Regions:
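Beta-rich carbohydrate-recognition and catalytic domains
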Residues: 1-94, 103-146
Length: 146
């Protein structure tokens, strides 16, 4: 039998915050079932999370949470920030999930890669924003597997 041993030649890079989770469904200003992993960025001195939130039907949307220290005193948008739009984007019929946020200096805007989910399966889509209040959907960039 083998045992897992922490290698001694690698320094510890990260330590899990003892107060996790920093956000739960109870923190949301509207009824939700669960909150999941978020895309994160720093805007000035503010930490911004674009959080995957599952509603009580099991469909996901994205919601913005802001904090001055990235740990406490979160200010969460009163309504879903980036809800699915299946009337115009069929690939979002079952929700939008798992955002990743990147500042693109050449464009002077944030690009968001997210999972659009529908009966055809999950696929990667892009959107852009300058303020995390309004968004331009750029559409799918990777088709569903299969």
């Amino acid at each position: 039998m083998t045992s897992l041993v922490k290698p001694q030649h690698y320094p510890e890079l990260f330590r899990r915050y003892e107060g996790n989770p920093i956000l739960t469904a109870n923190d949301w200003p509207y009824p939700v079932h669960t909150v999941f992993n978020a895309g994160a960025c720093q805007i000035g001195s503010t930490t911004l999370l674009l959080v995957r939130v599952e509603d009580r039907r099991g469909h996901s949307h994205l919601s913005v949470a802001r904090s001055d220290d990235g740990i406490s005193n979160w200010r969460i948008d009163a309504q879903p920030t980036f809800p699915p739009d299946p009337a115009n984007y069929a690939e979002e019929a079952w929700g939008v999930e798992d955002a990743r946020v990147t500042w693109v200096a050449d464009r002077q805007e944030w690009i968001i890669a997210y999972t659009a989910f529908s009966p055809i399966g999950p696929l990667v889509s892009l959107a852009s924003t300058v303020d995390f209040q309004s968004f331009i959907r750029l559409g799918p960039v990777m088709p569903p597997r299969g």
